[in-house]
Amino acid sequence: MSIEERVKKIIVEQLGVKEDEVKPEASFVEDLGADSLDTVELVMALEEEFDIEIPDEEAEKITTVQSAIDYVQNNQ
């Protein structure tokens, strides 16, 4: 499974959204209905899945599906 597929799977699981809603440009808050707790849990799930640490100042910049994919790809 590619990084993109794994990130999307985590987003579907964490936010309880349909897979076809998880488009690269989708915003977690505006498009996928996440709140601040959801986004924290999403970052924690990404850290666990990819065995990386995402500092708070970086986590704040991860606001869309594509930004999450890009961050993981650049920090693997």
From Swiss-Prot:
An annotated GO BP: lipid A biosynthetic process
Keywords: Cytoplasm, Fatty acid biosynthesis, Fatty acid metabolism, Lipid biosynthesis, Lipid metabolism, Phosphopantetheine, Phosphoprotein
Organism superkingdom: Bacteria
Domain Carrier span(s) in chain numbering: 1-76
InterPro entries: ACP, ACP-like_sf, PP-bd_ACP, Ppantetheine_attach_site
Posttranslational modification: 4'-phosphopantetheine is transferred from CoA to a specific serine of apo-ACP by AcpS. This modification is essential for activity because fatty acids are bound in thioester linkage to the sulfhydryl of the prosthetic group.
Cross-referenced Pfam families: PP-binding
PROSITE patterns, alphabetized: CARRIER, PHOSPHOPANTETHEINE
Pathway it works in: Lipid metabolism; fatty acid biosynthesis
Residues modified as O-(pantetheine 4'-phosphoryl)serine: S36
Gene Ontology CC terms: cytosol; membrane
Compartment(s): Cytoplasm
MF GO annotations: acyl binding; acyl carrier activity
Role played: Carrier of the growing fatty acid chain in fatty acid biosynthesis.
Family (UniProt): Belongs to the acyl carrier protein (ACP) family.
HAMAP family the record matches: Acyl_carrier
Name used for this protein in its record: Acyl carrier protein
